[in-house]
Amino acid sequence: MSGKESLSNFYGIWHLSEWSVAKIDGDKKFPYYGNVMGYLIYHPDDWVSATLMEKNRPELSENRVQLSKLRKKITDDIDLSVSTEMQQDMQDYFLAAHGYISYTGPFEIDDVNVHHHIRTSLLPQWIGTTLIRNYSFSNDYQQLTLSAAQGDYTDKLIWKREQ
């Protein structure tokens, strides 16, 4: 499958049905114990936006003064002694960020892979890179499976088309 006409099979909004990670030895795990949700949006201008997150992440402080002080402490101060409230904010923000992945950028396909060219991302090291995912469609183009091997692990994400 290649060419512009097949790109249209990707277009639309997809919700995450399952995300698993398998080791070479067959051991299979589910990130965040399967407590995940996500959306993948393929736009007809050949752009993709992906968001995956752990459900039930901690609510975060919206106290801008407190957060500004905390940012200053982390970036400017040598003495990182912080109040209990700031420690809780740091923990909550770490857990919230650790349980969240997002990126966007243009995409293209070849016969077996979709290439996501990352322009923005929660993970700074992804910006300017290309994520390559093997793809397959099933159920009359209502299900999209993406997989990628990395070292001894293979991530497999099953997406269902939003109705």
Language-model features, listed with the residues they occupy:
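Lipid interaction determinants
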Residues: M1-Q163
